[in-house]
């Protein structure tokens, strides 16, 4: 795991507030995520965790506050622009192309990086052919990394839930993000699947140098893989520290962990 010592923040949230029809979802949230770390976001259901990720990658526009990513400050941004900047994302509900193969789903994550025009791709001429080979090689490496070789041509609709989550992670990784936002990547998984996914997340962080921000409810996983934990409750930040410090924070214990943690 990485320490923020001598590292710069890749993400800075400052005084972020978000409301829907007058109902506050997030109130005055500020925290930093440091380059190369794994930051877990925890809290009860309805605490504002997913809303916060949606603000970071432009799905929601906050009424107040600013976000700085990789040195660039903004108050609003479209998800497409966030992806171009280097922010990748997976969601609670799997959003894959059900009828497409594992390979083609992961390949779709490379679309933003393709420079050839429509006709070059349609006719497979000029730079399109070379580009196709380069992107396919990168995708094959991701497939091997995630252990999906034997099902690479299988339609994702026929795969078990845990494998679909792995494919979604691969598609996000295919875009070469500087930072990955993972919304409950282990929800609904068996213990074995959780172990595999947590290992993949750590290897992505270590081998690709990708900063990770994830929402997770399994405190064993959070304690094991996180460098930094942010805790939300009713849309407000009540904890922001190393895992051991957060586990001993009385406000966090009262709001989320309970006395038996």
Could you describe each region identified by the protein language model?
Residues 2-261:
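Glycine-rich phosphate-binding loops of nucleotide-dependent enzymes
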């Amino acid at each position: 795991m990485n320490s923020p010592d001598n590292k710069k923040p890749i993400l800075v949230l400052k005084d972020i507030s978000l409301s829907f029809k007058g109902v506050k979802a997030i109130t005055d949230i500020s925290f930093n995520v440091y380059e190369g770390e794994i930051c877990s976001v925890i809290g009860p259901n309805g605490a504002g965790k997913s809303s916060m990720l949606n603000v970071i990658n432009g799905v929601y526009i906050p009424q107040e506050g600013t976000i700085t990513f990789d040195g660039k400050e903004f108050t609003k941004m479209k998800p497409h622009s966030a992806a171009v900047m280097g922010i990748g994302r997976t969601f609670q509900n799997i959003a894959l192309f059900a009828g497409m193969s594992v390979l083609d789903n992961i390949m779709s994550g490379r679309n933003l990086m393709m420079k050839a025009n429509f006709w070059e791709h349609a006719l497979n001429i000029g730079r399109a052919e070379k580009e196709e080979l380069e992107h396919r090689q990168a995708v094959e490496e991701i497939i091997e990394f995630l252990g999906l070789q034997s099902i690479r041509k299988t339609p994702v609709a026929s795969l078990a839930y845990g494998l679909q989550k792995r494919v979604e992670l691969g598609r996000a990784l295919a875009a070469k993000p500087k930072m990955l936002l993972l919304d409950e990547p282990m929800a609904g998984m068996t213990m074995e699947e959780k172990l595999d996914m947590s290992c993949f997340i750590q290897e992505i962080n270590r081998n690709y140098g990708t900063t990770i921000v994830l929402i997770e409810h399994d405190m064993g996983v959070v304690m094991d893989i996180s460098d930094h934990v942010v805790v939300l409750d009713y849309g407000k930040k009540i904890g922001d520290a190393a895992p051991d410090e957060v586990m001993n924070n009385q406000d966090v214990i009262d709001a989320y962990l309970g006395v038996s943690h």
